[in-house]
Amino acid sequence: MNGGNESSGADRAGGPVATSVPIGWQRCVREGAVLYISPSGTELSSLEQTRSYLLSDGTCKCGLECPLNVPKVFNFDPLAPVTPGGAGVGPASEEDMTKLCNHRRKAVAMATLYRSMETTCSHSSPGEGASPQMFHTVSPGPPSARPPCRVPPTTPLNGGPGSLPPEPPSVSQAFPTLAGPGGLFPPRLADPVPSGGSSSPRFLPRGNAPSPAPPPPPAISLNAPSYNWGAALRSSLVPSDLGSPPAPHASSSPPSDPPLFHCSDALTPPPLPPSNNLPAHPGPASQPPVSSATMHLPLVLGPLGGAPTVEGPGAPPFLASSLLSAAAKAQHPPLPPPSTLQGRRPRAQAPSASHSSSLRPSQRRPRRPPTVFRLLEGRGPQTPRRSRPRAPAPVPQPFSLPEPSQPILPSVLSLLGLPTPGPSHSDGSFNLLGSDAHLPPPPTLSSGSPPQPRHPIQPSLPGTTSGSLSSVPGAPAPPAASKAPVVPSPVLQSPSEGLGMGAGPACPLPPLAGGEAFPFPSPEQGLALSGAGFPGMLGALPLPLSLGQPPPSPLLNHSLFGVLTGGGGQPPPEPLLPPPGGPGPPLAPGEPEGPSLLVASLLPPPPSDLLPPPSAPPSNLLASFLPLLALGPTAGDGEGSAEGAGGPSGEPFSGLGDLSPLLFPPLSAPPTLIALNSALLAATLDPPSGTPPQPCVLSAPQPGPPTSSVTTATTDPGASSLGKAPSNSGRPPQLLSPLLGASLLGDLSSLTSSPGALPSLLQPPGPLLSGQLGLQLLPGGGAPPPLSEASSPLACLLQSLQIPPEQPEAPCLPPESPASALEPEPARPPLSALAPPHGSPDPPVPELLTGRGSGKRGRRGGGGLRGINGEARPARGRKPGSRREPGRLALKWGTRGGFNGQMERSPRRTHHWQHNGELAEGGAEPKDPPPPGPHSEDLKVPPGVVRKSRRGRRRKYNPTRNSNSSRQDITLEPSPTARAAVPLPPRARPGRPAKNKRRKLAP
């Protein structure tokens, strides 16, 4: 740079030469001595010292010209004039960053960042607390990357958050900063309530309305949708704006611009935000509450959203949901986009924002989910939409991935919104829908619906996603919906409480009322459902928001739920899980595709308070939601669900039957659980997709109990076979459908935390818990009893999940005997067979396995002896099959006996062991009981030819086991022969024995 150039005068030998100071360096005269201070702070007082410094390793030499002439650049003559050119200060020096060292670059970057933040904040939050919003707003913005320049500034603002995208947490920080105003960050929750509107992050509109509009898009745009949203938001938000200004605060403002606002505002203007949030809805008022929830979500989400990734926002909020959603998304990734954004976008977007805001908090909490979110992100489109609102949330970055989730968030928000602002519900739920709408997948609900025929109503809604949401309640009048939200606004007041739950319900009901709408909004309905039906959930969401506690999770749940619901048609439905917060009732939107998503609403707890108030409305919501769900899954099915919805809270929705099974058990164990779940779900969803999954249950749980909220739809083939499931629906949705993942189940067990919660199945809380869950899953739908069964839901779940749809029918039959937990399993035998792996996963299986063959035997079984493993190996001949079936069945059925070969043996059922050995060996029951003994016996018992073949194998193993190693060895040799002769198994078997033998020896 200037360094050497300016010293051109140096060559005048003699007399002081004008010197310029290299960029990044400082020259000062102390006590007649000249000191050069390097960019790293080292002080150099002489040319010698300078040369030594420049030649040393690890010293900063930035800012010096390339061919460096030390005497020219460093002039230690105190009298030498200094030309300004070289100073490292000023625009010129900042322009040439190539010559700036990291030290300098960082300093310049920080200065620039602050500068930009100031500008963005100031203009960004025209009226809102510029400062607060400034900071993070930007952060979200940046993530959004969108135009919102403000965003960028924001980023800087965030500084930490600035990383914004990078550091969602920062974002949160920012928020807090923001929050300064409200502390909000946390406030995000608190704020959220007020923020309700926030959620509207629509905040955009809020103060910025116009201005923000653009930014909002960014925020919104954070999500992919942002683009549309920008406009949509703008339009919808802006209007919303009216209340919005405060909304800005909606953390949800998250949209970058708004985010700023909402950030700053977020904290403050929560109330207005709502309107923003729901820009679509007049309900800013109501929105606010929702907002608050939203708000916080957005914070969480926002951050996520902030990340361009849509997902981000949502993701964190719903770990589980995101996971689920991811799974769902995996199945239907496409969905999101479509809906997304189209008409609904604008409106939805607002809702989405709100949702996102609510989500955001949660989101923040669950940063880990990002991964899932990423998955979601794939679905992203919709997510993004949701996220968008959240974008502002600095969090976004962390959850960029989550953004996809975001849609969910939006859904959640919707849910929240639903709950939050009753209308919100409509709004919110619609919001959710809207969010969904934003998110393509969620659109399922709202957005999706537009895209999808599913929501007949949608049509009117379609245009407005948000509208659609609201529309759901009154499809045609999204605005109305928004208005509705207003109504809830009072509810909003209760924001913290169900935040909108109560309000939501009202809204939601309308949605119900709009039965038509349901179809289209099925997802939405699900949201509504969750809102209404699961006031707890919704309430929980809001609560957390207001509380600023984990509840955000609930938002997540909601959003998940929304997503799921939305997913109904769309793959990306995301389960909601209110993890913490509250009881959020789980919603069981059905995923249209087989994919069952089980969403655990983890909300149970917090929401309880909320629940009550919201509870009534919530139930409506739930009811409406369910119908929606029902609709969602099948395009047309919704109607039945509407019917189901009819039974607001408690009734299961027959209609849900069509829905794909989604079960959202309220899970305490949240995200991780869900995450696991989601994986399972993802795996499962596809297979089931063939099946129409029916929502097994979806009972709309009682509004009151968050737990009851759980409804499940079975996606499992079994579930579908369970056509009964629907009837089950009458029952509490016991079927949790395979939807639940084993992990889910496992989580459920953790869930056990509160059976009540679990009770997501309307039914009673207790049994439902893991056992129930598991059972239900197992049965697929057929077995309502699952409730009773608490056995390893996990195993059951796994089984059901893994079971291919093909087997569903068989399972169906068994469902008849779903009464016993195990028995329901038998119903699933085919499933079992299909899912031997499941069997193994099932805890029971392990037991069985272990029981069967204590050490080696079990191993052997695993190796191939076992039914499960054996199955894998055809070499065993039919045995593998029989054994496998039995083994599996045995595992699942326990005493029942093997489905295949074992049916006969069912009496023996002694052990799965037995089944293993016994399948082949009719007799050797005793063997089964004692692993070692059985082995010996097996070896000893040469009678059964089939058995022999096995025997040979066993022998191989047994040799080490049995004391008669020599005899066994001998036997082994003959065994091959005998085997070859007697056993149908190919002579290859003889070889196998060798293999086995080797194996035995090796261990």
From Swiss-Prot:
Q: What are the boundaries of the region Disordered?
A: 120-219, 238-664, 683-1003
The annotated regions of Polar residues compositional bias extend over 707-718, 959-969
Which residues does UniProt assign to the signal peptide?
none
What the record says about its domains?
A: Possesses a methyl-binding domain (MBD) that is necessary for chromocentric localization. The MBD may lack methyl-binding activity.
| Residues of the MBD domain | 11-81
User: Bias regions of kind Basic residues — which residues?
Assistant: 947-958, 989-1003
Q: Please describe what this protein does.
A: Non-catalytic component of the polycomb repressive deubiquitinase (PR-DUB) complex, a complex that specifically mediates deubiquitination of histone H2A monoubiquitinated at 'Lys-120' (H2AK119ub1). Important for stability of PR-DUB components and stimulating its ubiquitinase activity. As part of the PR-DUB complex, associates with chromatin enriched in histone marks H3K4me1, H3K4me3, and H3K27Ac, but not in H3K27me3. MBD5 and MBD6 containing complexes associate with distinct chromatin regions enriched in genes involved in different pathways.
Spell out the Pro residues composition-biased ranges.
Answer: 140-155, 268-287, 391-407, 439-456, 570-589, 603-617, 805-817
Domain of life, source organism: Eukaryota
Query: Gly residues bias located where?
Result: 635-649
Keyword annotations: Chromosome, Nucleus, Ubl conjugation pathway
**Other remarks?**
Named 'methyl-CpG-binding domain protein' for homology to other methyl-CpG-binding domain proteins and the presence of an MBD domain, MBD5 and MBD6 may have evolutionarily lost the ability to bind methylated DNA and are recruited to heterochromatin by alternative signals.
Query: What is the scientific name of the source organism?
Result: Homo sapiens
- The name on file for this protein is Methyl-CpG-binding domain protein 6
